[in-house]
């Protein structure tokens, strides 16, 4: 009657409420006695990019940052499947059964590439390297992509990532990358959707 717009959102009320309740009831489980760790969470329809629910933080009154959409953090080892392995597989350079080196390796500055307290072991399959999130196989995979001239930047930009430098040796382990939970969820949406990226949306 007033000629206004009707805005429809993708948020599923039941899902969104369940996510808020989970944080309210179990958020304390991430406490480590050094302060109150924050949480951010996004649930997305992998086939469309529609956001079905999200958690912006544990307590908006005490911390008014939206940790799902605004706060950027290093994605650390969750970078490996997206920036290293998926691109190598797409390029036909390896498959899940490919054997990769996990022998002790140093960065160019001489510092060893560590995995917890381990400097490396031996050869292992890509599947095992990914399952246990070993660092050295990811390092060598990314180095191979660079040496073969694969345009990693193009892959990442097509998934909405904004990464300023690609010559960082620790990049596949999250070094030099800051991203929101929503954006990183969108990256994984691409993998779950057979490599087809759909930009996230709520309206």
Protein language model annotation of sequence segments:
Residues 9-17, 73-78, 94, 120-124, ...:
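Soluble non-cytosolic domains of exported or imported proteins
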Residues 93-152, 168, 193, 197:
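Conserved catalytic neighborhood of penicillin-recognizing serine enzymes
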Residues 3-10, 30, 66-74, 112-119, ...:
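Second-shell loop/turn segments in exported
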């Amino acid at each position: 009657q007033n000629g206004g717009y009707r805005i429809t959102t993708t948020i599923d009320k039941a899902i969104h409420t369940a996510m808020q309740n989970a944080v309210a009831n179990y958020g304390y489980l991430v406490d480590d006695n050094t302060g109150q760790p924050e949480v951010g969470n996004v649930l997305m329809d992998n086939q469309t990019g529609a956001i079905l629910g999200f958690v912006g933080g544990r307590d908006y009154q005490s911390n008014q940052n939206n940790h799902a959409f605004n706060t950027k953090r290093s994605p650390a080892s969750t970078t490996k499947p997206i920036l290293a392995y998926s691109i190598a597989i797409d390029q036909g350079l390896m498959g899940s059964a490919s054997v990769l080196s996990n022998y002790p390796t140093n960065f160019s500055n001489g510092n060893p590439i560590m995995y917890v307290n381990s400097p490396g072991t031996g050869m292992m399959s890509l599947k095992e390297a990914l399952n246990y999130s070993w660092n050295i196989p990811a390092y060598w995979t990314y180095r191979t992509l660079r040496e073969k001239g694969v345009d990693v930047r193009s892959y990442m930009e097509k998934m909405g990532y904004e990464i300023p430098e690609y010559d960082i040796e620790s990049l596949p382990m999250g070094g030099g990358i800051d991203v929101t939970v929503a954006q990183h969820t969108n990256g994984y949406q691409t993998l779950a959707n057979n490599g087809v990226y759909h930009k996230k949306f709520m309206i």
